[in-house]
């Protein structure tokens, strides 16, 4: 188990992690939040690339801030931006990474690398330099390097940003096949990634873990409370943002479709619609509802 207790991290006046508490068991956990929420700071801390100012992080009962090698030997990490040796082929680079991870048996390395390259659909490109890969291919290669050594903890940070829909789906399919016996943390600002993949999730904003629960539980929390209306006048939209709990606005054929959170109909012209995960996400992120009725209070 991975246990994060009362963790803080500051960069000058910025409180990047503010009293984070989170326990994770094997399975896929999605961490949603806008850019600047503190997600990458948390991921880098879990990967032992930096230490918290306060609090403890334990992995299977061992404090990783004091004994980082305990988690490093079990970790697969795909950061938001990762560099490669520009002239090395995918095959050679994975072999190099495998050696760094402690896989000394050449035959074992060869078998693992071949299996992973086939799994991420890069086997036919094994002799090509990784620097020549497209964005989607690089991300799939990133998954392969993260899975070398059969890690029990996998951290992926903003993995689908910039990918086209097909590459995004390929990536999520690979991640979903990584194994139910591993703790997999998917940190992203893309709501669909969590919706499509995770059975457990958290919402992070301004350095705090605002809420943690199953996606369907967060959706159920506001069921029957999301109303929508097409508004033609921009001034009316601006006023609604002041007067109501506006979840989202989007332009549609010259007008603005406004979605609001309300326990009952706000009035004439408003229509009740099915709740989506993004509604629950914005409701918690904007402080329209608290986490007190969720399964896991942050």
Language model segments and positions:
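Walker A (P-loop) phosphate-binding loop of ABC-type ATPase nucleotide-binding domains
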Residues: 34-38
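Helix-to-loop junction immediately C-terminal to a conserved catalytic motif
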Residues: 47
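Conserved ABC transporter NBD signature motif
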Residues: 55-66, 70-71
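Conserved ABC ATPase "signature" region
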Residues: 95, 99-102, 107-125
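A short, proline-enriched helix->beta-strand linker immediately N-terminal to the Walker B motif
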Residues: 148-152
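Catalytic Walker B motif of ABC-type/P-loop ATPase nucleotide-binding domains
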Residues: 154-158, 163
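ABC transporter nucleotide-binding domain
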Residues: 170-259
């Amino acid at each position: 188990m991975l246990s994060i207790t009362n963790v803080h991290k500051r960069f000058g006046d910025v409180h990047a992690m503010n009293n984070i508490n989170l326990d994770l068991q094997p399975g896929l956990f999605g961490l949603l939040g806008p850019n600047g929420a503190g997600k990458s700071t948390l991921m880098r801390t879990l990967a032992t690339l930096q230490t918290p100012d306060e609090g403890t992080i334990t992995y299977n009962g061992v404090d990783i801030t004091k004994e980082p090698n305990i988690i490093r030997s079990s970790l697969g990490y795909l950061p938001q931006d990762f560099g490669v040796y520009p002239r090395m082929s995918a095959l050679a680079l994975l072999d190099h990474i495998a050696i760094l991870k402690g896989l000394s048996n050449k035959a074992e390395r060869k078998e693992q690398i071949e299996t992973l390259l086939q799994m991420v659909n890069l086997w036919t490109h094994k002799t090509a330099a990784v620097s020549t890969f497209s964005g989607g291919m690089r991300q799939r290669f990133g998954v392969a390097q993260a899975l070398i050594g059969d890690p029990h903890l996998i951290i992926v940070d903003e993995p689908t940003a910039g990918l086209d829909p097909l590459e995004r789906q390929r990536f999520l399919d690979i991640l979903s096949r990584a194994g139910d016996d591993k703790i997999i943390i998917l940190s992203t600002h893309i709501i669909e990634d969590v919706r499509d993949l995770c059975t457990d999730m958290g919402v992070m904003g301004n350095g705090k873990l605002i809420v943690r629960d199953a996606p369907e539980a967060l959706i159920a929390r506001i069921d029957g409370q999301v109303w929508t209306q097409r508004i033609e006048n921009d001034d009316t939209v601006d006023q609604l943002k002041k007067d109501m709990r506006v979840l989202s606005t989007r332009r549609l054929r010259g007008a603005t479709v406004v979605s609001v959170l309300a326990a009952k109909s706000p009035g004439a012209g408003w229509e009740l619609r099915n709740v989506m995960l993004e509604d629950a996400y914005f409701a918690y992120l904007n402080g329209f509802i608290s986490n007190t009725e969720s399964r896991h209070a942050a």
